[in-house]
Regions:
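Glycine-rich beta-alpha junction loops
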Residues: 12, 35-38, 91-94, 105, ...
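Glycine-rich beta-strand-centered segment in the early N-terminal region that forms part
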Residues: 22-36, 51-99, 140-142
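Cytochrome P450 core scaffold surrounding the K-helix E-X-X-R motif
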Residues: 41-46
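NAD(P)H dinucleotide-binding glycine-rich loop of Rossmann-like/cofactor-binding domains
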Residues: 65, 95-175
């Protein structure tokens, strides 16, 4: 198996580089990435650089966080997955011990490790990536990995619609053309 990944060199220029296939830690799965959605934040990162630039100017910057693929290896403590399982990921991995995480609001954890952003800028535009078992989800049999890559943006869109209390017959305006907004239109 070989691995490569796309990294941002400077705004507007990406490069495909060879990379080692990562080895999963004891609580991680190794995923062969099959599909990656392109989010508005990826477009911004490509055009202007990351929202929060890395402290190290030599830091590799990967893009992409909406992805799905197939498990090819698992860490020694992984119990929910086996090679061959089709999965998608929650791209934000919280600290697990702050006030918000303990209240079940891990999506607003101030120390979340969100793919393609600080602290490590690892992106999903790669052939293989490792991800924690607890933030990896098995796809149902009737969903392919292309659809699986859209679960995260669909969840964000659904959450936004629920917060806005959108109901049939209610007049709303949706501005924008990204993946999430396109899914809200549906």
């Amino acid at each position: 198996m070989k691995n490569s990944k796309a990294i941002l060199q400077v705004p507007g220029t990406m490069k495909i580089i060879s990379a080692e296939i990562p080895v999963p830690k004891e609580d991680e799965v190794l995923i062969k990435v099959e599909y990656v959605g392109i989010c508005g934040s990826d477009v911004h990162g490509f055009e202007s650089g990351p929202f929060i630039p890395p402290k190290d100017p030599n830091q590799e910057i990967g893009l992409g966080h909406e992805c799905a693929g197939t498990v090819v290896a698992v860490g020694s403590r992984v119990r929910k997955f086996k090679p061959g399982d089709r999965v998608n990921i929650e791209p934000g991995v919280p600290c697990g011990h702050c006030r918000y995480c303990l209240e079940g609001k891990y999506n607003i954890c101030p120390d979340v490790d969100f793919m393609a952003t600080q602290p490590n800028y690892r992106g999903a535009l790669t052939h293989y990536l490792c991800h924690p078992e607890s933030f990896t989800y098995k796809l149902p049999d009737n969903m392919d990995t292309m659809e699986g890559a859209l679960v995260e943006p669909a969840a964000v869109g659904m959450h936004a619609a629920m917060l806005a209390d959108v109901k049939p017959g209610k007049k709303i305006i949706i501005l924008g053309a990204g993946c999430i907004l396109s899914l809200i239109h549906i």
